[in-house]
Structure formats: structure tokens, C-alpha cells
């Protein structure tokens, strides 16, 4: 039976080369699966670190543009600065008199 691909060799003993190859292949697959699972768990725990690696740093044009919250706070500050003299002007124009107060009398 020369050249046969059976499990039995010519002398009647079992040929283990197929089994050894299968065992080696399954060991490799098992290692690949375990390493993949470990990498998945690491990525799940350290998502922010990994995303920081792949994020593009801001360009020069982005640095000159202020953020939305900075713009809003500056607008609000400017509005307060503009409104302050107006309120002071109104306070100085109104004489401090008793006409603004209400007096109650009991009868």
C-alpha cells in the first residue's frame, strides 16, 4: 500500500502525523484566540489611551480659533462691561428721594 493516505501505515501501526499536525494547529488557534481576547479586554479598559494615539493633533488653524465656551464667556463679559456704565448713569440721574419709597400707616 505504498502512497496510501490512510491512517494505518504499511506495518500496521497508526500514523500520528495527521494528529500531531492537528494538535499543533489547534494550539496555534488557541493561542491566537487567547491573545485576541486579552487585547480586546485591554482595549476595553484603556479606550481613551488608544483613541489618543490615533487622534490627529490640532493644526495651527485650530489653535487660533477659540472654543465655543470661551467665546460665550467673552460675549457675556463684554455685555456686562457695556451695561455697567449705563446702569451707573441711570442711578446718578435719578435723585435719591423719598418718593421711591412707600410708607404705610396704620389707622
Swiss-Prot record:
Residues 88-107 are annotated as: Disordered. Keywords: Membrane, Transmembrane, Transmembrane helix. GO terms for cellular component: membrane. InterPro entries: SMIM19. Residues 93-107 have a biased composition (Polar residues). It comes from the Eukaryota. This is Small integral membrane protein 19. It comes from Mus musculus. The gene is Smim19.
